[in-house]
Amino acid sequence: MTEQATTIDELAFTRPYGEQEKQILTAEAVEFLTELVTHFTPQRNKLLAARIQQQQDIDNGMLPDFISETASIRDADWKIRGIPSDLEDRRVEITGPVERKMVINALNANVKVFMADFEDSLAPDWNKVIDGQINLRDAVNGTISYSNEAGKIYQLKPNPAVLICRVRGLHLPEKHVTWRGETIPGSLFDFALYFFHNYQALLAKGSGPYFYLPKTQSWQEAAWWSEVFSYAEDRFNLPRGTIKATLLIETLPAVFQMDEILHALRDHIVGLNCGRWDYIFSYIKTLKNYPDRVLPDRQAVTMDKPFLNAYSRLLIKTCHKRGAFAMGGMAAFIPSKDEERNNQVLNKVKADKSLEANNGHDGTWIAHPGLADTAMAVFNDILGSRKNQLEVMREQDAPITADQLLAPCDGERTEEGMRANIRVAVQYIEAWISGNGCVPIYGLMEDAATAEISRTSIWQWIHHQKTLSNGKPVTKALFRQMLGEEMKVIASELGEERFSHGRFDDAARLMEQITTSDELIDFLTLPGYRLLA
């Protein structure tokens, strides 16, 4: 392989091949990736254009709603193809980036599934993406190990968790690979390489190539994925439905199309997941032009609020009607070494997971192995001897309306909340552009979704000239003043050495740009990616 393409349909790689690349970017793997890019990039580009058009319609007054043209799919009696036996019990899933030590610890945790993440908890610099593929290949083969500087060795225990790979969203490019002069979709890069290197070993041990699909906004995007999966199955002579996917419902448009998404992916889908933090971010972003739909402090927007509880219940009802799993959302808490503080953390996790389990969710997400026992105990109590709650149909529920899904929750906009948003967003952006996408901040394991909520909340308050609870109007000038003040707080909290050696000035500049721009920037990871190696 050369770095430059020699024909119009070859892929060009901007990085030279080292030892790591040679393991993953083999001639056969690149040939398969090239086929996918050639076949599916044009339609992916049309889907991204459709997102822009849909947002323009919403901005102009057309609120999201259930689609009248697809009512026949919602009304018809059909089910998904089925769920493999090793995915029938997903009561606790742990998520984390594809870094070697984290992969081992997650697979060894007291959980049923590990979602290995190339998306929101990974800052996708080239080396991390390639190393991530190597780490997952070694995990699938059972050969993965890691030793730290102190000589401690990490390796897999018997019967590790089931592995699911989350690929990047449709909007994210892989800038180190181009096709016809354009960057290729990161989603196809992640999918092609994980599938190609692992499908045989996964099937041989009774599992399969399983994926999580993020940031979907329409059933047409789900149909695109179904075509990608079917192409891969046909290419390698695999039965239809070998590839399985769980799709995150984490955008406001998608919540109105859950039946249609399940139907479009019915050969491959096994469930939907409540991606709650990105859903809140999407709510703000999608309804950004509506002054009557502004959310309060991030800390006040919890899953017991009516619009989020409606989303959870509708997802359960829709999934179980179609024989699909309804997965609960993320508990981002980190256990504390302080016993009293840790008890508070575990009680919050218990309450959160109890709400999900009692609503009828089949399982839930955690971000730290230290929460596994608590989450597991909650679901064990509810499930008893059952593997899941597919029989919980919620047929007694009144129909959930578009108005319920779109109604904002009450709560204050406080100066303390705004300042906390600034500190969290700046610290997260600094970590992300430094190559770390999964960051402990103030006792929570944060990924991109939290920073997205933080910066879009402030943008929305500025845009609609909202007032804080202490009477201060939220303006660009107030934000810039607070940003300067909170940078000093961050410096004092972290210490001069960490602060001066970090990229906090770059992070503050990016935060300032995306929070004060007249047009809301779609994803902070897009301009952030330009600052990443």
Label each PLM-derived region with a short phrase:
Residues 2-533:
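Expand to "…catalyze enediolate/carbanion chemistry for C-C bond making/breaking, isomerization
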